[in-house]
Structures are given as C-alpha cells and as structure tokens.
Amino acid sequence: MVTYSKIIKKLSADVPFVGPEAQERLLGSVFKVRLGANESVFGPSEKAIIAMQNCISKDVWKYGDPENYDLRNEIAKRMNLGHYNVIIGEGIDGLLGYLIRLIIEPGTKVISSLGAYPTFNYHVRGSGGELIFVPYYKDHENLDSLIKAASKSGAKLIYFANPDNPMGTVHSAKKIEEIIKKIPDDCLLCIDEAYADFSPEEFIPNID
C-alpha cells in the first residue's frame, strides 16, 4: 500500500487560497472586478491579442522553450537587468514554490506575518519548514518585528508583501531599504510586489 510522506501526513486538508472561480460558483454570481486575483479591469491590449492570434498557427502547438529564453531576455532588456536575474513561473504561486524548494528543508524556520498570503505558508509547510508568525501593527506588516523575529530564531527566510494583500497597506521604499540593512547575513528577504502597480512609484524600493 502506498503511503504519504511524513510531511504530507501532517498537513491539514484545506485549500490555502480559494480561487475566484470557486467563489463565483459558490455565490452563484460573477465578480465584476477581480482585484483579489490581481487582474486588469481593462483586459489584454489589442497588440497582445493580435500577437496571440498570429502565433496560434505557428508555435502554440509545440512544447514551449523550457528556458523561456526569448521572454527572459526581453524582460531583462526592458528592466535593465541581466537575463540571469529573470525567472519565469506559473504566477506568484509557482515562483514562491520554486523559492521554498531552493531554501527550505525540514525544520528550517521562516518568518511571515499572521494573516499574510496563505499560499506562501502552504509551500513552507509542504517542505517541512517551521513558520513563525508576527502580528500586524495598525493594519501594516510589522517590518521591524519581522527582522527581530528572524534574528532571534535563526530563520533563513522572511516574507512580506508590499503593498499588502488583503490589507491594502504599503510601506515606503525608504523604510524597506532601512530594514534590509538589518537582515542577518544568512537570511533571505522575499518581497512580494505583485500589487506594486497599485501604489505610487516612491513606495517601490530600488534594490540593486
């Protein structure tokens, strides 16, 4: 008889993030705007639609390039980065999964806010990591307390979102640049900027 791993057996049988489609089926109505899924209310641009239509008969039936070479290089060029600074994934959930698998092993401590993005927690638990939560302060993720918790516990990873979902609050770029200097050398800071386009430019840190 096939049995699950010890880590999987410890996981609760819940869904970390209920998608909008499931919520629509449950409610019996369709959301007019799905900001919680970070979707544009304007839809794709006409240029994007034409480009997708043009490629249907050419390449869409093939396996995609596993290195995403052209896409990574185009993004790197537009963002003034090296292509090695760009990774392509299945949305934020896929990218978080890659990150966790790179860094977290059973028993590794991870710092996050109590009430932050649940799918991040799902990936950490699935890898056997130990989550340490820091409460929000005045509806904001408490950055100073996140750093203190990491220093005290010996955590290898800190996660927070800026702007934050679901609270909608945001920290200034200056504040984030200040706390980066306080992070332990053996700890990685993961900033989820999925909603960066909803905030003023001065709230997005210029991190080299």
Regions found by a protein language model. Give the residues of each.
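Residue-level marker for buried hydrophobic side chains located in beta-strands
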Residues: 35, 189-190
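N-terminal small-domain helix-loop-helix segment of the aminotransferase-like
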Residues: 2-3, 7-93, 98
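Conserved core of the PLP fold type I
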Residues: 60-184, 190, 195-208
